[in-house]
Amino acid sequence: MSRVGKMPVTLPQGVDVAIKDDQINVKGALGALALTQNALVTIKNDAGKLTFAPANDSREANAMSGTMRQLVNNMVTGVTKGFEKKLSLIGVGYKAQAQGAKLNLTVGYSHPVIMDMPAGITVATPTPTEVVIKGSDRQRVGQIAAEVRAVRPPEPYKGKGIRYADEKITIKETKKK
């Protein structure tokens, strides 16, 4: 059995999990999330602990039990604490402004780039060169952060662009004659 799948998911106070048919619904202080249950995994709710087991002895079911356990664990963490990604803008004149549910980026193009944030995702700019993306769904927070970074990815010679706060960019040396 998968090592990750063996560990139960402990449900904190104030988190409700409902398993109906093939749908898993998690409700908490920061919202509600839903996930479709895989047929290869059986889930049991035992007094505040969710246990995951493969439905059969196949290798795929074993792997999927660990995957489902981690997805549900991320949902529980998301509705209690939430997730956030920090991005930093490096470059002369590069700045960001949060305008409600929109993010306005000035990153060296002839026009500002305006990005709409989907429901459930909040964006903040503590300083003009920092962007903080928060939400309860880990996958969506990471996806939106990747889309913001893709507007102007860091270039390898000077390192200018939008990067994750903890990302290390290796700077290349310029060509010598």
From Swiss-Prot:
Biological processes, Gene Ontology terms: cytoplasmic translation
Key word RNA-binding present: yes
Superkingdom per UniProt: Bacteria
InterPro entries: Ribosomal_uL6-like, Ribosomal_uL6-like_a/b-dom_sf, Ribosomal_uL6_a/b-dom, Ribosomal_uL6_bac-type, Ribosomal_uL6_CS
GO cellular component: cytosolic large ribosomal subunit
A single MF term (Gene Ontology): rRNA binding
Similarity-based family: Belongs to the universal ribosomal protein uL6 family.
Role this protein plays: This protein binds to the 23S rRNA, and is important in its secondary structure. It is located near the subunit interface in the base of the L7/L12 stalk, and near the tRNA binding site of the peptidyltransferase center.
Protein's name in the database: Large ribosomal subunit protein uL6
Organism: Polaromonas sp. (strain JS666 / ATCC BAA-500)
